[in-house]
Amino acid sequence: MGNSCYNIVATLLLVLNFERTRSLQDPCSNCPAGTFCDNNRNQICSPCPPNSFSSAGGQRTCDICRQCKGVFRTRKECSSTSNAECDCTPGFHCLGAGCSMCEQDCKQGQELTKKGCKDCCFGTFNDQKRGICRPWTNCSLDGKSVLVNGTKERDVVCGPSPADLSPGASSVTPPAPAREPGHSPQIISFFLALTSTALLFLLFFLTLRFSVVKRGRKKLLYIFKQPFMRPVQTTQEEDGCSCRFPEEEEGGCEL
């Protein structure tokens, strides 16, 4: 018992003596984090200059702080004991340790290529804003059937195969495909009625205009012919004129 205690005490003394000797041989080991051992000042611990840091003690130099620029934004400012932390601006996501790179986000149903975001090919899907397009699940490999068809944003939904369904059980049918955007029958009927009304109104207007123009033309023709019409004398006027003679001829009759 006494020997074991003696051995423990001796070991502790050796460790303490080793640390003391090491500190005497390398005074830079006493420099804490946030400082560096300045050889130009007789190995005195000097604080790290601005925009630099030392995360561990005993460093002879300080590391340059990271600058968050471009697609990066600062999540944590740099201090004398820790580096700055960056993340990506909206529309991008981090890649690598410590967010060393930023990658563009894509919409669901797309994947990022060298030329930018591209829609997933038929038979593949991507339900996230990052990553690659993955193939639809092959339901037949598991002896199942497709209940809901897959899209570029969603995987297929598998269900029991038709052989597994009992005769009295109701089969599940896939949902009806979404109708392509277009005109509803009500809107088409409305436009047809509106077009028919407009055509009838136009036909009535043209007929009325043609009638008015025709009447006006006859009246104008009559007015134009009035100055050129010769007045016709009555029978009494012609008889009265035939009975009158000049005075000289009347005088010559008295013989």
Curated annotation (Swiss-Prot):
SMART domains: TNFR (SM00208). One of its GO terms (cellular component) is plasma membrane. One of its GO terms (biological process) is regulation of cell population proliferation. One of its GO terms (molecular function) is signaling receptor activity. Disulfide bonds join C28-C37, C31-C45, C48-C62, C65-C78, C68-C86, C88-C94, C99-C106, C102-C117, C121-C133, C139-C158. Residues 1-23 form the signal peptide. TNFR-Cys repeats lie at residues 24-45, 47-86, 87-118, 119-159. SUPFAM superfamilies: Growth factor receptor domain (SSF57184). Expressed on the surface of activated T-cells. Gene3D superfamilies: Tumor Necrosis Factor Receptor, subunit A, domain 2. Residues 214-255 are cytoplasmic. It is a single-pass type I membrane protein. Residues 214-255 are annotated as: Interaction with LRR-1. Changing E250G: In a colorectal cancer sample; somatic mutation. Glycans are attached at N138, N149. Keywords: Cell membrane, Disulfide bond, Glycoprotein, Membrane, Receptor, Repeat, Signal, Transmembrane, Transmembrane helix. Residues 161-180 are annotated as: Disordered. The chain crosses the membrane at residues 187-213. CDD domains: TNFRSF9. It is found in: Cell membrane. It is linked to Immunodeficiency 109 with lymphoproliferation: An autosomal recessive primary immune disorder characterized by recurrent sinopulmonary infections, susceptibility to infection with Epstein-Barr virus (EBV), persistent EBV viremia, and EBV-induced lymphoproliferation or B-cell lymphoma. Receptor for TNFSF9/4-1BBL. Conveys a signal that enhances CD8(+) T-cell survival, cytotoxicity, and mitochondrial activity, thereby promoting immunity against viruses and tumors. This is Tumor necrosis factor receptor superfamily member 9.
